């Protein structure tokens, strides 16, 4: 309670003053305020002091300076004149608080005694204030220390948390829930002790019921926010938040407003943990942040956590010296000095190592518990430095890059289409001139799972384009060659491998056995191109080098063929070089220096026909078994027929390799020449056109050239490779960038689109040279439709081919182009709009490294959902499969946006968009309707979007949709999303709850609860929250028999606690009406009393504990209802649970017994009647102080009841009144028992004769009813006025002959001013006779 006042201001908390003579603080105060401000402040302090000294009842104390101010009072330093002790006095205005509850709690909690708890020494009550006398903690709160000196180191936080846990453990064992653990409520002393303050009364001094969510939410547990009630586990959650507060300087979610913070606490798995926290601290916090309070660890278990144990081990909790506070402050100062130092980002210092230096990773700002000092420096910051990680812990990023990038990816830049020299003699062209013997094998253009460097590279058994096949003069074979022809092919392969492995390949970076970091130059393309990386060092190499070419592919990839150096030098033709062509073209100035050595080994030399260097020696070949090469296709075939298909070869001929050399040679040459001549002319024409594409050309000439080039390309698509090899893409892009003639632009865009179609490598090349922004420019609305369509086709290729092109397209502003397409008129530019929709959908569908959230953020800046919602409306007007596909894609885009970060959700939650989407919900197909409902549901999970949803009539539309889909097959999926959305919107908001009630949600929910079992769990929370809404919502509940529905829920073990809490809340708001219905017994429905008794009887362990709190509040609020529970079956159940292991359960059971006894005619005699007297007497020796006190008062009540002769009592008379308040409630029982308890027989006879024959109540009756909360609805008759002593329309019923009468005249006069005249006249005489006596009762001190 000491620090409660600190919530109202940023100053130090109440009993947490700043150290008076600290130089640093005085300097800060001098620097932070001007002389005039200091004078004003001192004047204000003097005024506060003077007003505080006016309290005459504080006769034994001299008030000093004000320690802190809050919303409900102020805290002063005070001196006890009798003992000389310094104390803290907290003054609370009675007008703001329920005095009866304060009185009882303080009376009970002042008996608590523990070193880690601020001692309550008593209180003094005046006419206007309640003065609570507390132990004075001279060093202030942990919050003030953190505010003045900075963040705490982990070891100091662990030491403090150990003491806090000891205090919490004591409180929990006494049945007290702190409810407000935070740094401002943890006070420190000079001895280094920390003490808990503001416990037990914290939730009540705010004047709020447990169902209210008001105030600073950052320390609240999820179950408190969800109105499930505070438990001891709630303190553990708050303790975790306090740890973060001390380590970080701020609690979790401090950068948010209260309502968003509440949503994050409930929805997140756990609050964000400090980034620099050690593993031990993070584990401790995760134990505190268990969402389920039943799984959350207790304070006793947390005391055994390694972090707390180590803290206690390093520094004992027992105070050692008076300088411990200064040491703690110095530790905090040194820690924050280390954080602010220039090397704060690199606190880890590398230790000198025998090996190469270890890269130092970025460090955390918070040390681990294993911090080690540096061996070099002994500065103050060294004690907080993290240890240097070992070699095993170091991250080698070079290894990551070495393994993440495949060799095939790195070698791709060496394979370019222009290396194929046009590809004119493709297999399709040559098919007319040559017959193909053998099997066609389809090559794969994509990356596969094989070990080859490139997916489309030749297979090991395919013909090798690097080998030169040429006829030799007929010659008698030598013995060696004859033997070679007789050996299997596999033996030749294996014997030749030894020579292959020793051939040097001139590469800049030979591949080592293990992956090593590669220099940047490795990724650059060399001007001297090399194909040596395609050579595979395995047995199949020679198969491809020396074998006959039986298998040819119709669709051979352009990258398959590359001419050898020897072939280029000896060709006389100007034709293209392809893997399928019969001859090689003339020498071309293309060099292959790096692979020359490797290829030269396979080139034939007229002067050297010895193959021993390739095939090995005879001895090696003899060692090979024949079975290794038994296949016909694997034998060595150099005796190919060079007639029609000589370049293809025939692997079935094994005899003389040159036997039929001259056969059909002239015929083949004639047909091949025709094909070569045709393609040569075509190539020359295309190369000439490309070379004429210059920006200096006249536009008319450019128009003619571009048109001719387009015509040739359309007739012969294979000219694509010629354009690429002639480097035609760059001239085309230059002209597109400079020229603005539409015909030229249109032709060139068509050529570009045809070249890049489904060729990701060419697309990447185009992106690398800056083609995307140039072509994206033509998507603008200022260009004609034809050009825009071509630009749209280019855009489509960019976003749907590969991840790399997509990333480059987005980086070049491509998403803006897609949004611009969406903004076109759907009627006129339907194709462009659909390209935009499909483009955005494809962006999200591609599985790349860029998160979808980033795309959402980029697109949300352009308000993409606004035009997209318009497109949705137009698409829904159409029929057909295409319209349904587009509808589904739009719905998926909306859904993806709702899964993005909160900033994106806030940007897309525009009223116009939401209104349009909600309007079209009814027209969408069921599957897409559910997807769009998920979009709305996800938006409703963010508090900042709820107003936009409400303004878009979301509740109205969703309620109508729920009603319309009740009979449809997809009702369960639709209602699941709708109910979640309505629950998120109506939660903690009365206006939206009333809006939903007015739209008829209550009967729909009741129907769902009765018929749909799985959906019941979604509907019941909304229904139970309706009791917390305003008059409109409760009126709808009355209309639909909501109270009877709540009573029926008491039989459901999973919802009985929520239902009882709803009934109690409704009773608070409309006490008389609800009480009348609860007491109304009808044969056609179960009574409330029977339901309560059955509920307590059948409830399980956890449900039983949670039922007690709202039940005892309800009985305290309504004595007539409490009197109906004086039943043997209920008392039997209570008797079984009186010895429960938890002190809080025992205490609540005793409070329930007290409320029932007080409302009954027999009062304390019920204990003996139902056999609870012995059990309660045993509880007088309970270890929990509060349980002992309550049990003792019940025993006193029983004894007094026996003394007054309970059997002679007259029945209780209920007086008529115009007030809606139940007539047997006490007017005000805020005063404790006074020496005038036992009044004279004459005064007792006077009361009994005038106002009834009831026997006097004991002190317990006043105590029990003093805890009765008031109604929050000021417009309806409530109990607040009577209980708080303020004016109101309520009328209370005084017990006849009550022993503890009204405490002072002020409260009586306030109550009588609110009474009807008849009641007032009957009381005036009594008031005059008892004025002196009530004046003497003004002190609360027992």
Swiss-Prot record:
Documented EC number(s): 2.7.11.1
Record-annotated Protein kinase domain positions: 61-308
An annotated Gene Ontology molecular function: protein serine kinase activity
Pro residues: compositionally biased ranges: 11-22
One cellular component term from this protein's GO annotations in UniProt: cytoplasm
Cofactor: Mg(2+)
A single BP term in Gene Ontology: cell division
Membrane-crossing residue ranges in chain numbering: none
One Pfam family from the record: Pkinase
Region Disordered: start-end pairs: 1-47, 336-396, 441-486, 552-591, 1201-1342
Record's keyword terms, sorted: ATP-binding, Cell cycle, Cell division, Coiled coil, Kinase, Magnesium, Metal-binding, Nucleotide-binding, Serine/threonine-protein kinase, Transferase
UniProt-annotated binding residues for ATP: 67-75, 90
Composition bias, Basic and acidic residues: 36-47
CDD domains: STKc_Cdc7_like
Record InterPro entries: ARM-like, ARM-type_fold, Kinase-like_dom_sf, Prot_kinase_dom, Protein_kinase_ATP_BS, Ser/Thr_kinase_AS, Ser_Thr_kinase
Function as written in the Swiss-Prot or TrEMBL entry: Required for early events during cytokinesis including localization of cytoskeletal components to the cytokinetic ring.
Family: Belongs to the protein kinase superfamily. Ser/Thr protein kinase family. CDC7 subfamily.
Record's protein name: Cytokinesis protein sepH
């Amino acid at each position: 309670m000491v620090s409660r006042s600190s919530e109202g201001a940023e100053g130090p908390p109440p009993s947490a003053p700043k150290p008076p003579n600290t130089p640093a603080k005085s300097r800060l105060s001098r620097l932070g305020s001007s002389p005039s401000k200091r004078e004003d402040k001192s004047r204000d302090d003097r005024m506060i002091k003077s007003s505080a000294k006016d309290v005459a009842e504080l006769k034994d104390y001299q008030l000093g300076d004000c320690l802190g101010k809050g919303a409900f009072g102020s805290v002063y330093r005070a001196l006890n004149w009798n003992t000389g002790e310094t104390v803290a006095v907290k003054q609370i205005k009675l007008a703001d608080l329920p005095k009866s509850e304060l009185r009882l709690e303080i009376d009970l909690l002042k008996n608590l005694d523990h070193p880690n708890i601020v001692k309550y020494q008593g209180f003094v009550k005046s006419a206007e204030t309640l003065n609570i006398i507390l132990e004075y903690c001279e060093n202030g709160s942990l919050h003030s220390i953190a505010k003045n000196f900075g963040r705490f180191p982990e070891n100091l936080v662990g030491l403090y948390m150990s003491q806090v846990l000891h205090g919490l453990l004591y409180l929990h064992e006494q049945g007290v829930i702190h409810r407000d653990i935070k740094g401002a409520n943890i006070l420190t002393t000079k001895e280094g002790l920390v003490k808990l303050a503001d416990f037990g009364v914290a939730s009540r001094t705010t004047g709020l019921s447990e169902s209210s969510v008001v105030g600073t939410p950052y320390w609240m547990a999820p179950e408190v926010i969800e109105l499930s009630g505070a438990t001891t586990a709630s303190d553990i959650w708050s303790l975790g938040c306090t740890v973060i507060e001390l380590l970080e300087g701020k609690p979790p979610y401090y950068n948010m407003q209260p309502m968003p913070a509440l949503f994050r606490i409930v929805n997140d798995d756990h609050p964000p943990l400090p980034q620099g926290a050690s593993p031990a601290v993070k584990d401790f916090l995760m134990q505190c942040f268990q969402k389920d309070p039943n799984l959350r660890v207790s304070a006793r278990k947390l005391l055994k956590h390694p972090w707390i144990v180590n803290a206690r081990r390093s520094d004992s909790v027992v105070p050692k010296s008076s300088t411990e506070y200064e040491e703690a402050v110095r530790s905090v100062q040194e820690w924050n000095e280390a954080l602010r130092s220039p090397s704060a980002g690199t606190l880890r210092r590398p230790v000198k190592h025998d090996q190469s230096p270890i890269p130092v990773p970025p460090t955390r700002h918070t040390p681990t518990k294993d911090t080690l000092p540096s061996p070099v420096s002994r500065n103050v910051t060294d004690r907080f430095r993290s240890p240097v990680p070992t070699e095993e812990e170091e991250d080698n990023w070079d290894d990551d890059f070495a393994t993440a990038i495949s060799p095939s990816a790195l070698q791709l830049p060496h394979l370019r289409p222009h290396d194929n020299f046009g590809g004119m003699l493709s297999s399709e062209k040559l098919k007319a001139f040559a017959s193909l013997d053998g099997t066609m094998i389809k090559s794969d253009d994509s990356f596969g799972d094989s070990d080859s460097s490139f997916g489309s590279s030749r297979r090991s058994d395919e013909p090798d384009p690097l080998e030169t096949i040429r006829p030799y003069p007929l010659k008698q074979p030598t013995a060696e060659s004859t033997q070679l022809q007789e050996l299997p092919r596999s033996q030749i392969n294996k014997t030749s491998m030894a020579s292959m492995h020793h051939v040097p390949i001139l590469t800049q970076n030979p591949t080592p056995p293990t992956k090593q970091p590669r220099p940047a130059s490795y990724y650059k393309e060399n001007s001297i191109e090399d194909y040596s990386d395609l050579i595979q060092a395995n047995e199949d190499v020679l198969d491809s080098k020396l074998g006959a070419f039986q298998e040819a592919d119709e669709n051979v990839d352009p990258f398959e063929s590359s001419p050898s150096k020897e072939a280029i030098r000896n060709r006389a033709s100007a034709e293209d070089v392809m893997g399928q062509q019969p001859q090689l073209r003339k020498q071309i100035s293309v060099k292959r220096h790096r692979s020359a050595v490797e290829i030269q080994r396979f080139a034939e030399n007229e002067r050297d026909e010895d193959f021993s260097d390739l095939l090995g020696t005879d001895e090696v070949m003899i060692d090979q078994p024949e079975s290794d090469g038994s296949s016909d296709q694997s034998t060595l075939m150099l005796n190919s027929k060079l007639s029609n298909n000589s370049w293809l070869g025939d692997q079935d001929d094994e005899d003389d390799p040159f036997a039929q050399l001259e056969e059909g040679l002239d015929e083949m040459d004639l047909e091949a020449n025709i094909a070569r001549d045709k393609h040569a002319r075509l190539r020359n024409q295309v190369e000439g056109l490309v070379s004429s594409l210059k920006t200096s050309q006249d536009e008319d000439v450019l128009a003619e050239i571009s048109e001719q080039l387009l015509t040739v390309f359309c007739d012969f698509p294979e000219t694509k490779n010629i354009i690429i090899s002639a480097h035609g893409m760059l001239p085309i892009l230059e002209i597109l960038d400079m020229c603005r003639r539409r015909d030229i632009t249109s032709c060139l865009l068509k050529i570009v689109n045809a070249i890049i179609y489904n060729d990701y490598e060419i697309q990447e090349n185009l992106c690398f040279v800056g083609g995307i922004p140039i072509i994206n420019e033509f998507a603008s609305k200022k260009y004609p439709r034809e050009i825009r369509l071509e630009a749209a086709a280019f855009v489509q290729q960019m976003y749907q081919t590969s991840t790399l092109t997509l990333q480059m397209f987005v980086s070049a502003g491509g998403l803006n182009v897609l949004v611009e397409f969406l903004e076109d008129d759907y009627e006129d530019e339907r194709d462009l709009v659909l390209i935009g929709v499909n483009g955005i959908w494809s962006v999200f569908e591609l599985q790349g490294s860029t998160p979808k959230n980033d795309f959402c953020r980029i697109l949300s800046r352009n308000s993409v959902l606004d035009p997209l919602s318009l497109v949705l409306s137009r698409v829904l007007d159409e029929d057909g499969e295409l319209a349904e596909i587009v509808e589904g894609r739009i719905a998926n885009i909306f859904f993806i946006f709702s899964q993005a970060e909160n900033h994106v959700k806030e940007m897309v939650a525009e009223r116009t968009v939401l209104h349009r989407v909600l309007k079209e919900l009814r027209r969408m197909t069921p599957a897409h309707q559910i997807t769009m409902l998920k979009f709305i549901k996800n938006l409703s999970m963010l508090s900042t979007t709820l107003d936009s949803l409400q303004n878009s009539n979301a509740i109205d539309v969703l309620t109508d949709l729920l009603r319309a889909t009740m009979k449809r097959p997809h009702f369960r999926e639709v209602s699941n999303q709708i109910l979640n959305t309505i629950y998120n919107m109506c939660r903690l908001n009365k206006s939206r709850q009333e809006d939903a009630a007015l739209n008829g949600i209550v009967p729909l929910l009741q129907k769902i609860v009765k018929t749909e079992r799985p959906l019941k769990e979604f509907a019941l929370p909304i229904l139970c929250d309706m009791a917390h809404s305003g008059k409109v919502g409760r009126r709808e509940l009355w209309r639909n028999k909501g109270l009877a529905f709540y009573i029926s829920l008491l039989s459901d073990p999973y919802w009985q606690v929520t239902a009882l809490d709803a009934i109690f809340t409704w009773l608070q708001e409309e006490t008389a009406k609800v009480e009348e219905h609860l007491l109304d017994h009808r044969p056609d429905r179960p009574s409330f009393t029977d339901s309560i008794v059955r509920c307590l009887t059948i409830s399980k362990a956890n449900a039983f504990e949670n039922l007690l709190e709202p039940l005892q509040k309800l009985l305290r609020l309504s004595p007539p209802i409490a009197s109906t529970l004086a039943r043997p079956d209920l008392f039997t159940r209570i008797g079984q649970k009186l010895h429960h292991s938890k002190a809080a359960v025992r205490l609540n059971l005793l409070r329930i017994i007290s409320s029932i006894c007080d409302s009954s005619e027999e009062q304390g005699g019920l204990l003996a009647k139902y056999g609870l007297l012995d059990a309660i007497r045993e509880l007088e020796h309970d270890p929990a102080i509060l349980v002992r006190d309550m049990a003792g008062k019940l025993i006193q009540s029983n004894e007094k009841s026996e003394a007054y002769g309970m059997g002679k009592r007259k029945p209780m008379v209920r007086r008529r009144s115009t007030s809606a308040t139940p007539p047997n409630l006490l007017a005000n029982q805020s005063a404790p028992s006074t020496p005038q308890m036992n009044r004279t027989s004459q005064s007792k006879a006077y009361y009994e004769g005038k106002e009834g024959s009831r026997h006097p109540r004991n002190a317990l009756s006043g105590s029990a009813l003093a805890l009765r909360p008031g109604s929050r609805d000021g417009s309806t008759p409530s109990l607040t006025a009577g209980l708080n002593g303020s004016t109101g329309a309520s009328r209370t019923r005084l017990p006849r002959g009550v022993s503890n009468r009204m405490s002072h005249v002020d409260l009586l006069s306030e109550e009588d001013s609110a009474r009807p005249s008849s009641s007032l006249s009957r009381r005036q005489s009594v008031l005059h006779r008892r004025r002196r006596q009530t004046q003497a009762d003004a002190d609360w001190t027992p």
